[in-house]
C-alpha cells in the first residue's frame, strides 16, 4: 500500500509551497497507512484539518469521510467542506452523527478553546464520541485541560510529517480517548 499512497496522495513538493498561514503539516505515507488501517471500521468519520488523511480514506478504502478544511485543493473529495474552524458554522445532514473525529490542527495559530468549540459543534456536544487529536507534546497539559471532558490520553502512536525533519517527529503526539489498532495508550 505504501507505494500506492506515494503515487496518489498529492505530491509533497507541491506542499513545500504551502500557504504558511495555514500551518499545513501533512502526514507521511506510513502514518496515513497506519491511521486508515486502524480506523477503517468506523462508519461516520470526520477529518478536521487533516485533508491528506481524508484523501487516503477515499482513495484506498473507498470511504467517503467528511473533510473539513480551509484548503480548496482538496475540494475534489466527495464530502469536502470548506470551513475556517474559528469563523464558520458547520452544517451536516440532520441525521448525521460522527462516530470518530480525527483532528490535526494548526499548532500555533489556533486557540485550543476555539478548537474545542468546533469539535463540540461537530460532535453535537457528545464528549463520549471517539476523538483523536495530533498535537505538540510540549503543549500536552493545555490540550488535556482544554479537552478534559473528552478524557484524552497520549498514545504510543508515532507521528510523522512529510515537511518536518525526522529528528523533530518526537515532538508530536497522538491523543485519543480510545484504543484501536496502532493507537494504544502508554
Give the positions of each predicted feature.
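C-terminal substrate-binding/active-site "lid" region of AdoMet-derived donor-dependent transferases
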Residues: 112-181
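Flexible, charged surface loops at secondary-structure boundaries
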Residues: 37-43, 59-60, 93-97, 123-127
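A generic structural signal for alpha->beta connector loops
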Residues: 62-64, 77, 128, 151
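Conserved proline-anchored active-site loop of SAM-dependent methyltransferases
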Residues: 45-49, 97-112
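Hydrophobic beta-strand segments of well-ordered beta-sheets in folded domains
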Residues: 43-45, 64-65, 99-101, 127-134
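S-adenosyl-L-methionine
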Residues: 1-63, 68-96, 163-181, 185-186
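Gly/Ser/Thr-rich loops at beta-strand to alpha-helix junctions
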Residues: 48-54, 109, 138-140
Amino acid at each position: 500500500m505504501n507505494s500506492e499512497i506515494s503515487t496518489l496522495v498529492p505530491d509533497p513538493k507541491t506542499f513545500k509551497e504551502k500557504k504558511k498561514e495555514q500551518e499545513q503539516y501533512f502526514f507521511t505515507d506510513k502514518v496515513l497507512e497506519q491511521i486508515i488501517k486502524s480506523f477503517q471500521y468506523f462508519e461516520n468519520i470526520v477529518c478536521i484539518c487533516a485533508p491528506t488523511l481524508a484523501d487516503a480514506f477515499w482513495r484506498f478504502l473507498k470511504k467517503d469521510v467528511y473533510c473539513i478544511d480551509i484548503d480548496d485543493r482538496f475540494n475534489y473529495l466527495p464530502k469536502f467542506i470548506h470551513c475556517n474552524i474559528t469563523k464558520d458554522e458547520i452544517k451536516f445532514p440532520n441525521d448525521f452523527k460522527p462516530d470518530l473525529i480525527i483532528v490535526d490542527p494548526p499548532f500555533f495559530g489556533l486557540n485550543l478553546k476555539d478548537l474545542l468549540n468546533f469539535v463540540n459543534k461537530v460532535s453535537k456536544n457528545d464528549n463520549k464520541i471517539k476523538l483523536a487529536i495530533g498535537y505538540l507534546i510540549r503543549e500536552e497539559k493545555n490540550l488535556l485541560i482544554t479537552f478534559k471532558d473528552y478524557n484524552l490520553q497520549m498514545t504510543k502512536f508515532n507521528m510523522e510529517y512529510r515537511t518536518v525533519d525526522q529528528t523533530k517527529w518526537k515532538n508530536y503526539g497522538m491523543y485519543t480517548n480510545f484504543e484501536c489498532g496502532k493507537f494504544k495508550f502508554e
